[in-house]
Swiss-Prot record:
Organism lineage: Eukaryota, Metazoa, Chordata, Craniata, Vertebrata
A GO-annotated cellular component: cytoplasm
Domain of life: Eukaryota
Species name: Bos taurus (Bovine)
Family under the similarity heading: Belongs to the Bcl-2 family.
GO BP, sorted A to Z: apoptotic process; regulation of apoptotic process
PANTHER family documented for this protein: APOPTOSIS FACILITATOR BCL-2-LIKE PROTEIN 14, SI:CH73-248E21.1
PROSITE patterns referenced in this protein's UniProt entry, alphabetically: BCL2_FAMILY
Protein name according to UniProt: Apoptosis facilitator Bcl-2-like protein 14
Modification(s) after translation: Phosphorylated by MELK, leading to inhibit its pro-apoptotic function.
Sequence ranges of Basic and acidic residues compositional bias: 137-147
């Protein structure tokens, strides 16, 4: 079932302290410049990040040429972020953290994504159209009226470098040569009053599992898949809460294999991926963007900020050059 009680939809109040926090500002800038703006120019369908790192051994992670072909268009906006040229060397997330890696050429054919959810016994509810363009416009106005903090810009851009260095999927072909998408979400219809709670929990688990899988795609592909699957979009909006956002992010990060890496490198990479996951969830929410950003700020503060401060701050754990944050 896709219904939720009022307590499920209760929002976490966004205090001034939260909206002025470094975590919130990083998420806010990342959403605007690395999820919504110029996404199609950065990530083409040929290079979708559709799997967790655990599906390939650490020593065999390929280096994708798609992420080393020059400066990203989004880095040339009117704000103070610096253009980042990646043509000098190929890099994976490991080399971004200073780990030597043998370069490999990776070629893949454009995968055809078939992730339309199969529906069985679901009442035809009137789908609610996503309202993120309006929220994005609101954020545009906000950022236009205040200069972006150079420190926030540098950290968000560094996070994007790390996230985009995540290797693309190996080619997986069916007999017809198409791409096999993992997991098909099947929504269950009403099962009677006695099993209502169980059905609701199962339905929520299915929604979370499907969202986790879709978050492995680029922001552009995620948006396309959700536009095709109105039931998934509506059901996610109905169950959205901090606990759901936390569960989705936790499950996504558990699928990332960082075996053989130091704690600092592993946690740094997961922190970057957490920011990317939370930013992409703003695409799905039907409420003002601040709602998901509030959830994301709380998640980062609870799960990463204390550890980051203990290890010298964002700049140090992300291995940022000193000149980027002067």
């Amino acid at each position: 079932m896709c219904t939720a009680s009022p307590c499920d939809l209760e929002e976490i109040p966004l205090d001034d302290e939260d909206s002025d926090s470094l975590e919130f500002k990083i998420l806010e800038f990342y959403v605007k410049h690395h999820v919504f703006q110029n996404t199609s120019a950065i990530l083409s369908p040929k290079h979708l990040r559709t799997r967790s790192l655990s599906q390939k051994g650490p020593e065999r992670w390929p280096v994708s040429e798609a992420w080393t072909q020059g400066p990203w268009p989004c880095r040339h906006s009117q704000s103070s972020e610096k253009a980042i040229n990646l043509t000098k060397k190929k890099s994976s997330w490991r080399t971004l953290f200073g780990v030597a890696e043998k370069e490999e050429d990776s070629q893949s054919s454009p995968p055809e994504i078939c992730a339309q959810a199969q529906r069985s016994g679901v009442p035809q509810a009137r789908p609610r159209s996503p309202k993120w363009p309006r929220s994005r416009s609101s954020m545009d106005q906000r950022l236009e009226h205040k200069a972006a903090d150079p420190r926030v810009v540098s950290i968000a851009n560094r996070v994007a470098e790390i996230v985009y260095s995540w290797p693309p999927p190996e080619e997986v072909h069916s007999q017809g040569g198409g791409f096999k998408s993992k997991g098909v979400l099947v929504f269950q219809g009403p099962q009677g009053q006695s099993g209502a709670e169980s059905t609701k929990k199962e339905g929520e688990d299915q929604i979370i599992a499907r969202i986790v899988e879709l978050l492995k795609y680029s922001g552009e592909q995620l948006e396309r898949e959700l536009k095709k699957d109105k039931v998934l979009m509506t059901c996610f909006q109905d169950v959205l809460s901090y606990s759901v956002v936390k569960t989705i992010t936790d499950q996504f990060l558990r699928g990332v294999d960082t075996r053989g890496e130091s704690e600092v490198k592993a946690q740094s990479f997961k922190a970057a991926l957490a920011i990317d996951v939370i930013a992409k969830l703003t695409t799905i929410d039907n409420h003002p963007m601040n709602r998901v950003l509030g959830f994301g700020t709380k998640y980062l503060k609870e799960n990463f900020s204390p550890w980051i401060q203990q290890h010298g701050g964002w700049e140090k754990i992300l291995r940022m050059p000193h000149e980027e944050v002067d």
